[in-house]
Amino acid sequence: MKFAPITDRLAGLGAAKWAVHAEGLRRAGLGEEIILLSIGEPDLPPPASVINKAASAMRQGRTRYAHGQGEPETLIAIAKHLTNRSGFLVTPEQVLYTAGTQNGLCTALLTLVQVGDEVLVPDPYYATYEGLVAASGATFVPVETLPEDNFHVTAQAIENAITSRTKVLLLNTPSNPTGAVLSISEIDAIGEVCKRHDLWIICDEVYADMTYDAPFCSPFDRPHLRDRTLAVSSISKSHALPGFRAGWVACHQDVIPRLTLVAEAMLFGSQPFIEDALAVALNEKHPEVERLRLAFRERAETLIKSFAESKAISARMPEGGMFIMLDVRKTKLSGEEFAWQLLNQHNVSVMPGESFGNGGTGHIRIALTVESKILKDACDRIRQLAEKLIATAN
């Protein structure tokens, strides 16, 4: 019996990246007191009105097949949300409803690339991106960013990575894992490179509502880049509803029919009651959204203060999102080695930086998904391990 080549391409791209997290979960399930900072799942409650809408919609019979592109009222809500954000009109014909950001990214890639094409991705990158590109059959090409530049990708670095086979640039702003938020000038410079080489831009914007001081900018919000951009997002993070799997792709209306063909092959519609809830999430103002953003910022500041005097750990304040990358290179360990020792010796689960590409080497990623008191305790344990390692090395 033979399996399809896609399974070979995906083998080794998933489970190994999450091994520390999986072990932390296993131990927590056995009753050990593990501080889990290894996954980005908001810990604060979602807006009650969104939950109530999903429940009432189910009771009202909204459990049948939905439209392939999305329910009309849902598409209107998403289009209005994006119009209000940018100031430029977005119509429902420019929107596809998806089962979360991951499904939206997969749909976009399967629509745009094939075997032989190349997809450029700033490194570090979200852990699933390699698998998404591999599933499409295209070649994954990392583009270097530097810690001293706060992991901001440059137009020149992208230009240097382009070949005759390059088809797509996959951006993520704010970035998971780095927290980098691309500025308008950076987006415009990158966009000029993409225009010059006729590249598509897929932009993962799931943390768009979680910037701190730097304003959010999407290439889809820039009129000269809109026609080549597919903006992908969801309410998973902003509204603390990752289990709803409710998201979208926004792009030129001529692309939507192609995206819909791929989406229907995978899902053949979604859950109308979830789509109704998404419409409420975007149509109404919810204090929980701002409360979540402020909580992550306050926790990030707590973490930065915890390592301000450390000679073993370097921490940079993220510009957005719900993660911080800690530089542990002074300990002489890789991020993965440090993460395993931290779990085994101090009961704290974090993600190794190497799970996010070569650019994450010597780093660990901290999720800001626990209250500040617990986060400070975890920081104390991280600092203890790092200082012990440095003392031993000396």
Language-model-detected regions and their locations in the chain:
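Short, surface-exposed loop/turn segments at secondary-structure junctions
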Residues: 65-66, 290
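Short beta-strand to alpha-helix junction loop
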Residues: 69-70
